[in-house]
């Protein structure tokens, strides 16, 4: 089997494996009592990761340069990065729910590259003069890895919003994931429930108070509210989160923060490397090319996210919404500007 045939087989195999893996993760989420299904999902993601890595390696050997010169190659590198970050996030969170959100994205990317792009864009071609530089690997690979990490982190933020149904849940963990009302039989009640509390509750957590009601046979109740709440407050009843759902939400919030914290410095390094390469190739560090502009917008969005988490102490819904918007911004930066068909970075134009 020659390298071209191997690549054709591997790209189709990667799509098939990711499709089956997506189904396994969805079945595992629908029927949590089947741990073998979840284990098979993890194995499928690892197999897909290895298949894509083998495809990229074969293409590297065939073409003689790092396979990031066109849209087809970058899409597969992006899907490889997403599967890699997925495996890291899943191992860190010990939650198979991560795959419910990341696998469809990885599969969609592979499907787009394999089934949508014309065949002439899937063939290795000699590098254009502007890409004949050692900066190709340094700049493009780091940018693609940053996109992968930021996408996965944003997907986990979207998963957090789904788990909490978009409600503003107050988490007791720090920005690096310590603490939280997820043990000792407590459940966290949201604003809107009927609560009865003493006139002067003990103040904790920068103005928030932890209040406990009597045991009613269903476990104690932990209520997080402002310390200035009067002795008895009647609010409109709302649905509470189960301890399991609350614990999962806190885990997703923490893992999302950590993954984005990994992707942001990669994005910073990639932008700096690109500026140096641009000066070497075109005589200017920054030319406000559409790709450069959206890379800066992406950097600002996630810089705001990390600033809100680290400096302002934001957790829960607000940073999750910001990260979810970052998911859209990353896609515009990576693929949207290529659809414009103009600019110094329009190598991926395919219409």
Swiss-Prot record:
What parts of the sequence cross the membrane? 17-37, 38-58, 68-88, 97-117, 143-163, 259-279, 286-306, 320-340
Q: Name one Pfam family in it.
A: Cytochrom_C_asm
Location in the cell: Cellular thylakoid membrane
Q: Which UniProt keywords apply?
A: Cytochrome c-type biogenesis, Membrane, Thylakoid, Transmembrane, Transmembrane helix
Single GO MF descriptor: heme binding
Membrane topology is: Multi-pass membrane protein
One GO process term, biological-process aspect: cytochrome complex assembly
Q: Which InterPro entries match?
A: Cyt_c_assembly, Cyt_c_biogenesis_CcsA, Cyt_c_biogenesis_CcsA/CcmC
Give the superkingdom in one word: Bacteria
Q: What is its main location?
A: membrane
**Cellular component per GO, a single term:** plasma membrane-derived thylakoid membrane
Tell me how this protein assembles: May interact with ccs1.
Protein purpose: Required during biogenesis of c-type cytochromes (cytochrome c6 and cytochrome f) at the step of heme attachment.
The entry sums up its family as follows:
Belongs to the CcmF/CycK/Ccl1/NrfE/CcsA family.
Q: What name has this protein been given in UniProt?
A: Cytochrome c biogenesis protein CcsA
Q: Which gene encodes it?
A: ccsA
């Amino acid at each position: 089997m020659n390298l071209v045939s191997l690549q054709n087989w591997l790209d189709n195999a990667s799509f098939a494996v990711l499709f089956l893996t997506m189904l396994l993760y969805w079945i595992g989420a629908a029927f949590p009592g089947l741990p073998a299904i979840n284990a098979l999902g993890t194995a499928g993601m690892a197999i897909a990761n290895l298949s894509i890595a083998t495809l990229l390696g074969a293409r590297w050997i065939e073409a003689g340069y790092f396979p990031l010169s066109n849209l087809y190659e970058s899409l597969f590198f992006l899907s490889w990065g997403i599967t890699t970050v997925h495996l890291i996030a899943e191992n860190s969170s010990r939650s198979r729910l991560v795959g419910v959100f990341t696998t469809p994205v990885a599969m969609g990317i592979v499907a787009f590259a394999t089934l949508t792009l014309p065949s002439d864009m899937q063939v290795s071609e000699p590098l254009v003069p502007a890409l004949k530089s050692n900066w190709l690997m340094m700049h493009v690979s780091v940018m693609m890895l940053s996109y992968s990490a930021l996408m996965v982190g944003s997907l986990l933020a979207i998963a957090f919003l789904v788990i909490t149904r978009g409600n503003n849940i107050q988490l007791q963990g720090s920005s690096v994931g310590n603490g939280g009302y997820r043990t000792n039989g407590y459940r966290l009640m949201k604003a809107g429930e009927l609560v009865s509390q003493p006139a002067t509750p003990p103040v904790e957590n920068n103005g928030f108070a932890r209040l406990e009601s009597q045991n009613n046979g269903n476990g104690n109740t932990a209520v997080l509210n402002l310390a200035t709440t009067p002795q008895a407050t009647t609010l409109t009843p709302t649905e509470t989160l189960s301890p399991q759902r609350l614990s999962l939400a806190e885990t997703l919030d923490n893992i999302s923060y950590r993954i984005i914290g990994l992707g942001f410095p990669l994005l910073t390094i990639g932008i700096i490397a690109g500026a140096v390469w641009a000066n070497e190739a075109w005589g200017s560090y920054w030319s406000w090319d559409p790709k450069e502009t959206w890379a800066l917008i992406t950097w600002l969005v996630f810089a705001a996210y990390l600033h809100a988490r680290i400096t302002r102490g934001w957790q829960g819904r607000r940073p999750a919404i910001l990260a979810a918007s970052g998911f859209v911004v990353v896609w515009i930066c990576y693929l949207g500007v290529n659809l414009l068909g103009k600019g110094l970075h329009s190598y991926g134009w395919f219409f």
